[in-house]
Amino acid sequence: GNIQKEPIAIIGMGCRYPGGVRTPEEFWHLLSSGEDILSDIPNDRWDFEAHFDPEITVPGKMYVRKGYYLDDIDQFDPQFFGLSPREAESLDPQQRLVMEVSWETLENAGIAPSSLKGGKTGVFVGQYWDDYSSQRIYSTDNREIDRYAQLSALRGLTAGRICHLLDSHGPAIQLDTACSSSSLAVHLACLSLRNGESDLALAGGVSLVLAPEHLIGICQMNALSPDGRCKTFDASADGFGQGEGCLLYTSDAA
């Protein structure tokens, strides 16, 4: 048959979304409730008032104060994943999230991660921002840059960390195609399953906004909605709302 038409089954899902959503069931409840979980930019991200001005045209400032942000992004158990506290401190929180959610999507699929050792599990991750490295690594005292800092600053290692965690011998593909990164990751995972490169695939993406510079830049483009909300296909649309999250699917050939 046509290999490009072979069906793919999504057998597991793990996620983190704003509003305290940590499971697929909580995500479904949020969608079905129609609740708006818009919130202020968390106080622990940066000095908000120093970077804010409600006037859209002010150089070097952001004009938005709200968006869709995750809670407790500093919470992580490094020992569970065999990491030292020093390495975990250097690790981009986006990589931490992907490690947690990859484990959870396998549990959701009823797969013991240890059973994948040596197998052809492919990992495909879309990741765009690199705020953590620019904020914590490249702007710090050079004497603080060690082997952990350098490795943890590389976006290209997120997928590889998961393959290392699972001892997988499948593809480890990291993608940055801006807004399409996650959808392309899923597309490539499907191709890998159909081509026989992977017996199982973890695919999705992660996004956290950890520094103000990118938001300032997007505001200077006048691309963000002043009230922080998306109004897709609506006459009142005036930009997009900045959001955060992490989603990974576990898929195999049906």
PLM features: residue spans?
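A glycine-rich phosphate-binding loop feature that marks nucleotide/adenosyl-phosphate handling sites
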Residues: W46-E49, G119-G126, A178-S181, G205-L208
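ACP-dependent fatty acid/polyketide chain-elongation machinery
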Residues: G1-E87, Q95, W103-E107, M221-N222, ...
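Flexible, low-complexity linker/loop segments at domain and module junctions
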Residues: G1-I11, P113-G119, R143, F240-C246
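Glycine-/small-residue-rich "gating" segment that lines the acyl/pantetheine channel
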Residues: D40-N43, T140-A149, G156-C163, L184-L191, ...
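Active-site-proximal gating segment of KS-fold condensing enzymes and close homologs
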Residues: V58-P59, K66, D74, P85-P93, ...
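Structural motif
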Residues: P7-A9, T121-F124, P171-I173, D199-A201, ...
